[in-house]
Every structure is written in structure tokens, then in C-alpha cells.
């Protein structure tokens, strides 16, 4: 029996991110919170340099980490530093917090594919960092858009958005010299 796996992603206000990710095949559960920062016991009013993030528990027999990341890059703009929509500041940065070297490798490879694809107009600024503490947000933030369907969000599914994978040759060139890989 394969056990569930965990991912932590940040990409703007956690309400919209959670709402779209929760419905993906293989996602078992989600919760919103704060990660990647410097304050213990982070709260909405005091989260220091933490990003608003979503912790995702997923069944790897139904979906994989790469598929989750491809969807993540579809529903938020990974090229705007410390900003999504009208939300500005480090709390709203794009970030992937990985749990092991395999997740790190997949994250970096997916970012390289996003950059090579030209689907976004600029350079990807998504932070890739080891997962640390995840401080669960207050109850009023959990499942927010499920309770308030017309609430604020700056995330949306882009119909027809598909991330192509780089060819083996371009991936090799990118790993040897990042500026040659595009």
C-alpha cells in the first residue's frame, strides 16, 4: 500500500489556491497556513516573512507531484515577485517548499519547462526551498471560498493551458548552461 504524500505551495492569497487545488484528482486534503518564514506560531496578524501557503496531501497512485506543480503554474503568475493580482508583499510570493531531493529536482525541472515554454511572459521567480514549519491558519481562512463562493480570488484555471516538456537535448543544454536552455 502506497502512503499519501505531502506538498506545500505558495502563490498569492491562499484562499484561491486552496479552492482550485482541492478539486484536483488525487488530492486527499488541503489546509491553508504560513510557511517559509521567520516567526514561530505564525498567525494572519503576525506571520513575519512567511508566505501564505497551502499544504496538500495527495495520493501518488492517482496523481503525482509533477502534475500538481503543472496545475500550480497554470493557476497563478510565477513571474511576478512578491505579488499576485492586487496582493503585494512577501506573503504573496510564489514558492515551492520541498520535502526531499526528488521533490526539489521535480520542482526545478518543472520551472525550467515553464520558462522554456513561453506560456508566461517573464522569468519565473518562484522560490524553491526546503519545507520547514507549516503553521495552520485560523479556522476562518480554511476552505474560505467553499463557504463564500463569491469571495476574493486572483487564481483561475486557464483553459487550454498545457505545459510542454523540454526535449532531452534542450534539458541537457539547460543543465549545463541555463542561458542556453531556452
Swiss-Prot record:
It catalyses: L-methionyl-[protein] + [thioredoxin]-disulfide + H2O = L-methionyl-(S)-S-oxide-[protein] + [thioredoxin]-dithiol; [thioredoxin]-disulfide + L-methionine + H2O = L-methionine (S)-S-oxide + [thioredoxin]-dithiol. GO terms for biological process: cellular response to oxidative stress; protein modification process; response to nitrosative stress; response to oxidative stress; symbiont-mediated detoxification of host-generated reactive oxygen species. Its EC number is 1.8.4.11. It comes from the Bacteria. Keywords: Oxidoreductase. InterPro entries: Met_Sox_Rdtase_MsrA_dom, Met_Sox_Rdtase_MsrA_sf. Pfam families: PMSR. GO terms for molecular function: L-methionine-(S)-S-oxide reductase activity; L-methionine:thioredoxin-disulfide S-oxidoreductase activity; peptide-methionine (S)-S-oxide reductase activity. The active site is at residue 13. One of its GO terms (cellular component) is cytosol. It is an enzyme of class 1 (oxidoreductase). Belongs to the MsrA Met sulfoxide reductase family. Has an important function as a repair enzyme for proteins that have been inactivated by oxidation. Catalyzes the reversible oxidation-reduction of methionine sulfoxide in proteins to methionine. PANTHER family: PEPTIDE METHIONINE SULFOXIDE REDUCTASE (PTHR43774), PEPTIDE METHIONINE SULFOXIDE REDUCTASE MSRA 2 (PTHR43774:SF1). This is Peptide methionine sulfoxide reductase MsrA. It comes from Mycobacterium tuberculosis (strain ATCC 25618 / H37Rv). The lineage of its organism: Bacteria, Bacillati, Actinomycetota, Actinomycetes, Mycobacteriales.
